């Protein structure tokens, strides 16, 4: 835990917190960003407000499944982070509460759009592009080139050298499928995924698992959000990232208040705090380098430069629909995951 950053965030949010000090005593949060970020959010918020934070860490697919299971008796107040598609699905299913923050005009257009297309049942809190992580030491040792396009990943040389998450549990992997469908067309995308399957060593439960495996020399290449790479590198691991030259998608990490929250005042207070620049800066403090949604948040130089990335016009509304997500994942299970490796 970075004590300097905690002190900074404490000072930055103290004035905001005082007005709410005695109003809310507990908030229950599902956190779908990396563990270090979740932990710092919990610590800083509790110290600045005196509110008890009960935080569970789950991937976005698992988080959505939990909210569905608890819909008649919600035990969660806020869902923080994770890819935006399942947040849109939660909105569609009536699992999240419509709420318009006064801070909305201060957010980037993509974050506001996420709120608008959900009926204000979610909001964008960060964005990050999909790409590849690779271990330069392993690639050199195995005499493998750096993959630069989606097509490169199909080369026989990469057999058993690639990890990606399982789309049934990971929003990262679902973003990959939705990106490929939009980039190639659906049938061609699934033919691609069948060929890619031959080179996959493991489908992990978590979207961050593959890039951590790359950093630790357990695999050569991952399909990951590239903002997860610099944090591993800052810890001394040999890892680099690249976005495919033929185009890629980006996530809009989101935040939602759960409909039926037992601690609604506390949920709204945490929601407002999480949109402030000082709270959003906690991501970089824990070596997470997504692009923050608040325009005034200081952007770390290690955050990917979106201007240098070939991004597709990702249809967040369509691929955030429950039926579309279910259909695409079921097709992947039937046509891809069932194949031998």
Enumerate the language-model features and the residues they cover.
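Periplasmic-binding protein-like
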Residues: 128, 192-197, 203-204, 235-259, ...
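A ligand-binding cleft/hinge motif common to bilobed small-molecule-binding domains
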Residues: 85-89, 215, 220-238
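Mature extracytoplasmic/periplasmic domains
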Residues: 258-316
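Conserved C-terminal helix/tail region of periplasmic/extracytoplasmic solute-binding proteins
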Residues: 314-341
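Extracytoplasmic ligand-binding site segments that recognize negatively charged/polar headgroups
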Residues: 33-39, 75-218
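Early extracytoplasmic/lumenal segment of secretory-pathway proteins
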Residues: 25-89
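Bacterial N-terminal signal peptides that target proteins for export
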Residues: 1-10
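N-terminal signal peptide c-region/cleavage motif recognized by signal peptidases
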Residues: 17-22
């Amino acid at each position: 835990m970075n004590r300097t950053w905690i002190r900074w965030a404490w000072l930055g949010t103290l004035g905001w917190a005082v007005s709410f000090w005695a109003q809310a005593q507990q908030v229950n949060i599902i956190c779908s960003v990396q563990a270090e970020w979740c932990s710092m959010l919990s610590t800083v918020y509790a110290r600045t407000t005196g509110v008890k934070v009960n935080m569970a860490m789950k991937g976005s697919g698992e988080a959505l499944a939990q909210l569905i299971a608890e819909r008649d008796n919600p035990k969660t107040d806020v869902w923080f982070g994770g890819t935006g598609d399942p947040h849109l699905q939660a909105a569609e299913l009536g699992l999240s509460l419509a709420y318009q923050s006064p801070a909305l005009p201060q957010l980037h257009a993509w974050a506001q759009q996420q709120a608008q297309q959900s009926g204000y049942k979610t909001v964008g809190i960060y964005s990050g592009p999909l790409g590849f992580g690779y271990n330069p030491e392993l690639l050199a040792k195995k005499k493998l080139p750096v993959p630069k396009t989606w097509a490169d990943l199909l080369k026989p040389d990469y057999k058993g050298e690639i990890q990606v998450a399982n789309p049934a549990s990971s929003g990262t992997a679902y973003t990959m499928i939705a990106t490929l469908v939009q980039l190639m067309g659906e049938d061609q995308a699934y033919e691609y995924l069948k060929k890619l399957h031959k080179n996959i060593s493991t489908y992990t439960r978590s979207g961050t698992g593959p890039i951590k495996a790359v950093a630790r020399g357990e695999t050569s290449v991952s399909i990951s959000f590239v903002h997860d790479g610099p944090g591993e590198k800052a810890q001394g691991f040999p890892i680099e990232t690249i976005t495919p030259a033929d185009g890629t998608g980006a996530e809009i990490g989101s935040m939602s208040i759960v409909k039926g929250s037992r601690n609604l005042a506390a949920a709204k207070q945490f929601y407002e705090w999480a949109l402030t620049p000082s709270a959003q800066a906690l991501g970089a403090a824990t070596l997470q380098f997504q692009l923050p949604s608040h325009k005034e948040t200081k952007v770390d130089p290690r955050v990917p430069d979106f201007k240098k990335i070939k991004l597709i016009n990702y249809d967040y509304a369509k691929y955030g629909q429950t039926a579309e997500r279910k259909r695409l994942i079921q097709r992947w299970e039937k046509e891809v995951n069932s194949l031998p490796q």
